[in-house]
Amino acid sequence: MSAKVPSNATFKNKEKPQEVRKANIIAARSVADAIRTSLGPKGMDKMIKTSRGEIIISNDGHTILKQMAILHPVARMLVEVSAAQDSEAGDGTTSVVILTGALLGAAERLLNKGIHPTIIADSFQSAAKRSVDILLEMCHKVSLSDREQLVRAASTSLSSKIVSQYSSFLAPLAVDSVLKISDENSKNVDLNDIRLVKKVGGTIDDTEMIDGVVLTQTAIKSAGGPTRKEKAKIGLIQFQISPPKPDTENNIIVNDYRQMDKILKEERAYLLNICKKIKKAKCNVLLIQKSILRDAVNDLALHFLSKLNIMVVKDIEREEIEFLSKGLGCKPIADIELFTEDRLGSADLVEEIDSDGSKIVRVTGIRNNNARPTVSVVIRGANNMIIDETERSLHDALCVIRCLVKERGLIAGGGAPEIEISRRLSKEARSMEGVQAFIWQEFASALEVIPTTLAENAGLNSIKVVTELRSKHENGELNDGISVRRSGTTNTYEEHILQPVLVSTSAITLASECVKSILRIDDIAFSR
């Protein structure tokens, strides 16, 4: 009797994994196609209405995808890729999604030829690694002291935004902000040291950089307290200067006016004691954290503080505490017994200023050794939509400069690096054998989606432009790309259309990793 042959049903149904892969690729590509029109300086903007009824107008890839109601789990992976690009490079969030979509299209064509998805994924990874090497060969080294080059890179980032007409003003502002908090030896920049403060009123031209700290809260003047302090000693407190309340709900029954008088006297003595301890520590500017349980500071305490000539700013948000303690060099104080002079920050000047119809408190000349260099940028605009988009654009420009601190190399923009990588990979693929040659060829073709999209969005003939670029790169003109200003191809490096090399290397690496993850999925199971 012959032995029973084990069942091989798992591998008999080959259609299901193919269908799942096809559905995943279609879902992911539909997301890429949705934001493809917003790439480049002539790219369109998207208007998004949030579930809360807010209106957002933006052409920042990450912002658009983050707000879109995407249900398909694989399509959500593209949102995560965009978020990863945003945190790694800050710019190129649209490019990375378009590139992922194009690589998935190439993978679909290869799958239809019967090539195994794991082989495709691994070859894409090796092609991406080679692409990064080519980009690093192409890049022009840049020094942080070369301010002009940094400004040009920031201007290129701003050129595709609504605020592009203000790029000559915002780009130097972004460069100066980053250079203030970094030095020639820095390998990274913490953008949390740059505080973007949004204030409605005025125009984008009124946006200013302040070397110090800006508070959106105003000084309290109701009790006649000061609004300007020179040689300031700043205290940041997290307790309330108001009568204490018990934790449990209870009532106090007063049946004699003398008892009432005693309660009021105790209250005065309690508050006066706190105010005297603050004055004893030589504090003359007091920042008080917002409280939801009771008044952060009551009228009687304000009266005492104004008599002691102490400037008071209340309602400091919990999220601001870390930045303020870092920027002012003061330590947050949670109890009056811990209020000592060594926990205070010091500054040359703290003053409330009137800026375009709204008041802000400005702290300049911070002189504490514990303080890290911080910069505040006050963003102005006619309405919240413009201010929000200006903030996003400025964040992208700051990220571009941060990229140049991390990896000090600039490459030409306008699709020039993608065309060059495509040409070099195609050439190398011809000398390969077997399936890998096919896959590298498809990877090279997929990279041309960036210059093609730039040309289409600029209203140019994409086939003619990309063919022209190919022949120019074949003749050794490595920096030739698409210039929207000239409505054709030109040396984009000489036209000052520049981008950090880290933006492109990060986009290609992340796109190939995402494609690898998607191709390796052969089934979707829903848990209960």
Curated annotation (Swiss-Prot):
Keywords: ATP-binding, Chaperone, Cytoplasm, Nucleotide-binding. InterPro entries: Chap_CCT_delta, Chaperone_TCP-1, Chaperonin_TCP-1_CS, Cpn60/GroEL/TCP-1, GroEL-like_apical_dom_sf, GROEL-like_equatorial_sf, TCP-1-like_intermed_sf, TCP-1_chaperonin. One of its GO terms (cellular component) is chaperonin-containing T-complex. GO terms for molecular function: ATP binding; ATP hydrolysis activity; ATP-dependent protein folding chaperone; unfolded protein binding. One of its GO terms (biological process) is chaperone mediated protein folding independent of cofactor. It is found in: Cytoplasm. Heterooligomeric complex of about 850 to 900 kDa that forms two stacked rings, 12 to 16 nm in diameter. Molecular chaperone; assists the folding of proteins upon ATP hydrolysis. Known to play a role, in vitro, in the folding of actin and tubulin. In yeast may play a role in mitotic spindle formation. Present with 5530 molecules/cell in log phase SD medium. Belongs to the TCP-1 chaperonin family. This is T-complex protein 1 subunit delta. It comes from Saccharomyces cerevisiae (strain ATCC 204508 / S288c) (Baker's yeast).
